[in-house]
Amino acid sequence: MFVIQPVNDSDAPELLLAFQRLIPQLTRNNPPPTLGEIVALLKSDSSVLLIARAEDSSIVGALSLTVYRVPTGIRSIIEDVVVDEHVRGQGIGEALVRRALEIAKEKGAAHLTLTSNPKREDANRLYLRLGFKRRDTNAYIYKF
C-alpha cells in the first residue's frame, strides 16, 4: 500500500535523503538536488512535486509536474518520474502519473507532455497504456 501526495516545505530534509537514493536510479547524468534546490523547487508557482509514500511513510517514488502558460495556452510536462527499484511493479508509477494528469487538468492544461528513454521499456508501456500517444516530433536539447 502507498499514498500519493504533494510535497510540502516540511518534507524537504526527508526528500533530500530520498533523492540521494532515487535520482541515481533514474539517471547518471545529473546529481541529486541539494537542499537549496529542493526548497527552490517547492517555492516555484509552476511546479508540483508529487511523492509516493510506503506504509512505513518512507518516500519510494517521485514525479515533477510543471504547469505553465504560453501565448497558445496552458501547457504541462512531467519530468523525473522515479520509483525505487525495490518496489517497482506495484502500481506506484501509474498512481503518480494519474495524479499528475488530474492536477494538470484541474489547472487548465490542454495536454500533458513527457519524454522517456526508449530503454525504459516498462515505463514506456505504462505511458502508452495510460493513453499517452507518441508524438511525431524531434526533441532537442541544448546544454550549457
PLM region spans:
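Conserved N-terminal entry element of GNAT/NAT acetyltransferase domains
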Residues: M1-P13
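Helix-loop element at the rim of GNAT/NAT acetyltransferase active sites that forms part
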Residues: S10, F19-P32
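Active-site rim helix/loop that mediates acceptor-substrate recognition in acyltransferases
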Residues: N30-L49
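Conserved beta-strand in the GNAT
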Residues: I51, S58-V67, I77, V82
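A conserved beta-turn-beta hairpin within the catalytic core of GNAT-like acetyltransferases
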Residues: Y68-I78, R88, R135
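Conserved acetyl-CoA-binding loop-helix of GNAT-fold acetyltransferases
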Residues: V83, G89-E102, R125, R129
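Conserved active-site alpha-helix within GNAT-family acetyltransferase domains
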Residues: E94, E106, P118-D136, I141-Y142
